[in-house]
Curated annotation (Swiss-Prot):
Known role: Removes the formyl group from the N-terminal Met of newly synthesized proteins. Requires at least a dipeptide for an efficient rate of reaction. N-terminal L-methionine is a prerequisite for activity but the enzyme has broad specificity at other positions.
Record: residues binding Fe cation: C92, H134, H138
Natural source organism: Ralstonia nicotianae (strain ATCC BAA-1114 / GMI1000) (Ralstonia solanacearum)
SUPFAM superfamilies, per the entry: Peptide deformylase
GO molecular function, one term: peptide deformylase activity
Keyword Metal-binding tagged: yes
Listed cofactors: Fe(2+)
Name this polypeptide is given: Peptide deformylase 1
NCBIfam families: pept_deformyl (TIGR00079), PRK00150.1-3 (NF001159)
Record's catalysed reaction(s): N-terminal N-formyl-L-methionyl-[peptide] + H2O = N-terminal L-methionyl-[peptide] + formate
Signal sequence region: none
HAMAP family: Pep_deformylase
Family label: Belongs to the polypeptide deformylase family.
């Protein structure tokens, strides 16, 4: 396993739309293992392949307190979302130290493949539902800050560029 470099907003590669995984093979399983290691090391609760500059439909998530309930979603698709919506404070490994409110469906049903290539469906709510939607946005080339006002987006870009310059010194 290896730690992968996480792209930082506003890197244009974060806006690439991920392609479906054709076959779940050893290359994809290695990607999943590397993504999980990277996510846990960061530390984060979710990571999309897009964030590590691999533009295939793969996400890893672990919202457990114990950090030992890894969930893998390959070629995920939301097949149902509740009309009820909820506002959550969201953050992102590609947008470090920035948190803001995003409104999303409160409950979703997702269909995907696991790391063995087996199809499954999961209906969930709460933090896991939010995380699935957030990571799936990455696969579509969207970062959570794009739900915010243009003014907030601009402030975030300025703040992140300032942090990048400070780290470069």
């Amino acid at each position: 396993m290896a730690l992968l470099n996480i792209l930082q907003y506003p890197d244009p590669r974060l806006h690439k739309v991920a392609k479906p995984v054709a076959v779940v093979d050893d290359r994809i399983r290695k990607l999943v293992a590397d993504m999980a290691e990277t996510m846990y090391d960061a530390p984060g609760i979710g990571l999309a392949a897009t964030q590590v500059d691999v533009h295939e439909r793969v996400i890893t998530i672990d919202v457990s307190e114990s950090r030992d309930e890894l969930r893998v979603f390959i070629n995920p698709e939301i097949v149902w979302a509740s009309e009820a919506r909820k506002v959550w404070d969201e953050g992102c490994l590609s947008v470090p130290d920035i948190y803001d409110k995003v409104e999303r469906p409160d409950r979703v049903r997702v269909r995907a493949l696991n790391e063995k290539g087996e199809s499954f469906e999961l209906e969930t709510d709460g933090l896991l539902a939010v995380c699935i939607q957030h990571e799936m946005d990455h696969l579509m080339g969207k970062v959570f800050v794009e739900y915010l006002s243009p003014l907030k987006q601009n402030r975030i870009k300025i703040k992140l560029k300032k942090h990048q310059l400070e780290r470069a010194r």
